[in-house]
């Protein structure tokens, strides 16, 4: 059902790796997903993947303050930074040498739009078609794509001040999981009153690593951008026996949530970013 749609999405859905190194020397990486929108390198992804970067900026200010105090008359009375303070941070945007510029993060909506610098349009053969939001209906078959289940070791080269991550073939490790559209969720508007907080709810959860990835229909048109997973209690409490002891279990249903493509298209239109829209006969939609 989704074979053709997945073949298209594999071209423009790419992994982003968020790597950090803390004061105690611990190096970790997490994976998310982004969607390349056009040949100019504009992308959309989830906003929360930048939380580590915000924390890094905060930690850097604190570390610099402590450094200044250590160099002052207080000297030895100044404590070291917290062991989990982030001292190095880096994003890897699907290709070496590529960095994100002109990024705008709508954290309350949980979306980010930005432009990849040093992007080569030849890297992506097919760009996404952003669906007509009026055609996203309850019960519609959908499929979510991203990069869960990736576990690898990241090193940090102290001399170069750079992270080293293993090579990956995104075409081989991308993972789809299917679902249906269950509901449209309206959470009102953002605090500044400028952005609609509208989402598409899905019958299966988004997995870690799929944040920022596309939720597509059977034709491959993007219906939403995956941002979160919510758990609902089923109010079933079966009693099970574990090692001779009776335990009451709570059962939950995990569902996914994606930013409605209607909102994404509106944000792109406001910034004059071109994209292919469902039903456009002329190809790319040019906003001047």
Regions found by a protein language model. Name each.
Residues 1-36, 43-46, 109-112, 124-125, ...:
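N-terminal activation segment of mature serine protease catalytic domains
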Residues 12-76, 117-119, 216-219:
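Catalytic histidine site
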Residues 16, 34, 41, 45, ...:
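Terminal peptide-recognition signature
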Residues 28-31, 207-211:
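Short, small/polar residue-rich loop motifs at catalytic or cofactor-binding pockets
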Residues 40-55, 92-154, 272-281:
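Conserved active-site neighborhood of the chymotrypsin/trypsin-like protease fold
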Residues 128-198, 206-210, 226-240:
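Flexible, gly/ser-rich surface segments that form the specificity/activation loops bordering the active-site cleft
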Residues 217-288:
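C-terminal subregion of chymotrypsin/trypsin-like serine protease catalytic domains
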């Amino acid at each position: 059902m989704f074979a053709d749609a997945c073949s298209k999405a594999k071209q423009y859905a790419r992994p982003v790796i968020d790597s950090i190194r803390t004061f105690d020397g611990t190096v970790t990486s997490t994976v998310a997903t982004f969607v390349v929108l056009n040949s100019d390198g504009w992308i959309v992804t989830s906003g929360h993947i930048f939380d580590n970067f915000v924390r890094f900026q905060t930690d850097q200010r604190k570390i610099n303050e402590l450094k200044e105090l250590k160099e002052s008359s207080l000297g030895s009375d100044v404590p070291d930074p917290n062991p989990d303070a982030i001292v190095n941070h880096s994003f890897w945007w699907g290709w070496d040498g590529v960095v994100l510029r002109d990024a705008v993060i709508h954290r309350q909506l949980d979306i980010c739009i930005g432009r990849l610098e040093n992007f080569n349009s030849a890297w992506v053969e097919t760009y996404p078609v952003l669906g007509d939001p009026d055609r996203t209906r309850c019960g519609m078959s959908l499929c979510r794509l991203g990069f869960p289940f990736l576990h690898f070791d990241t090193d940090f080269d102290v001399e170069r001040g750079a992270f080293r991550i293993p090579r990956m073939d995104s075409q081989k490790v991308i993972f789809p999981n299917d679902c249906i559209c269950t509901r449209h969720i309206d959470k009102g508007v953002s605090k500044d009153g400028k952005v609609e907080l509208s989402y598409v709810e899905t019958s299966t959860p988004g997995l870690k690593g799929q944040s920022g990835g596309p939720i597509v229909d059977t034709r491959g048109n993007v219906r939403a951008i995956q941002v979160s997973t919510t758990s609902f209690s089923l109010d079933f409490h079966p009693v099970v026996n574990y090692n001779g002891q009776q335990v009451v279990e709570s059962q939950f249903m995990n569902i996914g949530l994606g930013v409605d493509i209607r909102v994404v298209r509106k944000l792109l239109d406001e910034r004059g970013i071109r994209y292919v829209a469902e039903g456009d006969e002329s190809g790319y939609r040019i906003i001047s």
